[in-house]
Amino acid sequence: MILIPAGPFKMGSSDKDIMWAARYFHSESLDWYRDETPLHEVTLPAFKIDKVPVTMRDFSKYQQATGQPPSREHDNALFNHPLQPVVSLPWKQARDYCHWAKKRLPTEAEWEKAARGTDGRYYPWGNEADALNANIRGKGDIYRYTNQGGTIPENVSPYGVMDLAGNVWEWTENWYQPHPDNQYENDLYGEQFKVIKGGSWNSNLDLARGSVRGKALPGQKKNYIGFRCVAAN
């Protein structure tokens, strides 16, 4: 696990940030970005986070230890290499794995600090929208689906955490609620969706920005959603 030191960081996006994203990625509307605002300071205690997403090998050990049969969704050679991220599991099963491992799911703020550091950068590696630094859709890289954790050396955060942009969206602990002082109404806020972060092999580089707030129903099983765990320092 990687230590994330205590202290403040910049979470979310400013109006300037979302206007940059909308222009750069040719978005038709700023409405897609409004839930990222405002840019605000959050202070967190120190914590530790998994260096890479939980793997199929890790998850298989959990299933064996708890007497669970192999999941039917994992009988797919495109996604079940031992070192690929485990995918196609609901939020509760991800949370249960973390508890079994004496860890927990990250909060949205913890995940975002681990990805962006303290300077409000757009991507783990900085502000440059370089599609070669992440496993995303449509750039013709060697990964058609998920990649084994840590195999793209450029995809590293200021703290040394890997694969926080692209590869798999990652479950967080939080419900999809507005950021403090967010000024925009959204009918999807509430206790219906869980926040997912990071983008995936099946999404574009815009959605791999650290401030992006993906959302998924807790019961959904998607081959582009995985997770990692955190623990107290």
Protein language model annotation of sequence segments:
Residues K10, D15-D31, P69, H74-G214, ...:
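Functional-site microenvironments in short loops/helix caps that host divalent-cation chemistry
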Residues M1-G67, W91-K92, E128, R213, ...:
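Short, compositionally biased
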